[in-house]
């Protein structure tokens, strides 16, 4: 197993892509600390991990927007485990918002999406970096989006902008932390039916819109949360020991960006 003895934190772990990441990390031998704001759904994640790796998952309710809560959680993981080898910043989403003309977007809605999608990754990276520096190694993976590399199918300006910011944050921290043996990369999923928000978006497309979306993907199908998770495992593992500062699209060839 590629991650035997490693300890990893996964944010946004209550369902969908975050849950799949927890399962795949544990399958490869990692001890996983899963956090989210949804306590009940976190129990589902714990059960999913337990089914493949008994005893490999601990959960905690943490709001990534709350810097103090993030710092306390990271300190708790360090106290219990003595190390943090991997950090996967999955928390994100559109915060229940829908597309509106840019002139109608309130400041509070703009900031809310940035708080979840970008500030949260900053809070966790800031808290975990000293511990990884102490160890002389570490791997951080930020879950961005095709929206951050092109545009958002949701039409939500703040979402595309925050995900683009997360890609920039990935590059900058990779440059800064590389001398300490810490790698920072990003995985940019395409459209994945992984949670209630993506299901609502899928339903809103209608049959014709769904067909057009699938037709735009080179592999002519949607991806799965597990396929995103396997890319994350690669970046956390030593298979990616000489890879940092990169954003990899896992979208079935929808965008094919250089």
What residues fall within each predicted segment?
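Substrate-binding pocket helix/loop in short-chain dehydrogenase/reductase
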Residues: 98-102, 106-114, 202, 213
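A glycine/serine/threonine-rich, flexible loop-to-helix segment
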Residues: 179, 191-217, 257-258
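Active-site helix of classical SDR
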Residues: 125, 162, 170
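Canonical Rossmann dinucleotide-binding motif of NAD(H)/NADP(H)-dependent dehydrogenases/reductases
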Residues: 3-33
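Short, small/polar-rich loop/turn modules that mediate ligand/substrate recognition or access, typified
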Residues: 178, 183, 243-245
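Short C-terminal tail/terminal secondary-structure segment
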Residues: 94, 99, 233, 244-258
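Alpha-helical segment proximal to the catalytic Tyr-Lys
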Residues: 130, 149, 175-176, 241
């Amino acid at each position: 197993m590629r991650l035997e003895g490693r300890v990893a934190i996964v944010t946004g772990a209550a369902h969908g892509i975050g849950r799949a990441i927890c399962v795949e990390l544990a399958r490869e031998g990692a001890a996983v600390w899963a956090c989210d704001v949804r306590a009940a759904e976190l129990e589902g994640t714990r059960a999913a991990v337990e089914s493949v790796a008994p005893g490999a998952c601990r959960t905690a309710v943490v709001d990534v927007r709350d810097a103090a809560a993030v710092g306390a959680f990271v300190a708790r993981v360090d106290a219990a485990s003595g190390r943090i080898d991997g950090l996967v910043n999955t928390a994100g989403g559109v915060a229940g918002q829908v597309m509106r003309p840019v002139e109608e977007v309130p400041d509070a809605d703009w900031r809310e999406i940035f708080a979840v999608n970008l500030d949260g990754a900053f809070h966790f990276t800031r808290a975990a970096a000293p511990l990884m520096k102490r160890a002389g190694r570490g791997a951080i993976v930020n879950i961005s989006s095709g929206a951050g590399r092109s545009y958002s199918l949701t039409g939500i300006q703040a979402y595309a902008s925050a995900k683009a910011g997360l890609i920039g944050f990935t590059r900058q921290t990779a440059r800064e932390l590389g001398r300490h043996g810490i790698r920072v990369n990003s995985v940019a999923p395409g459209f994945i039916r992984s949670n209630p928000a993506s299901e609502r978006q899928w339903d809103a497309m209608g049959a014709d819109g769904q067909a057009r979306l699938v037709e735009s993907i080179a592999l002519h199908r949607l991806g799965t949360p597990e396929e995103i998770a396997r890319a994350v495992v690669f970046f956390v593992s030593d298979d990616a020991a000489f890879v940092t500062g990169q954003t990899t699209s896992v979208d079935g060839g929808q965008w094919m960006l250089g």
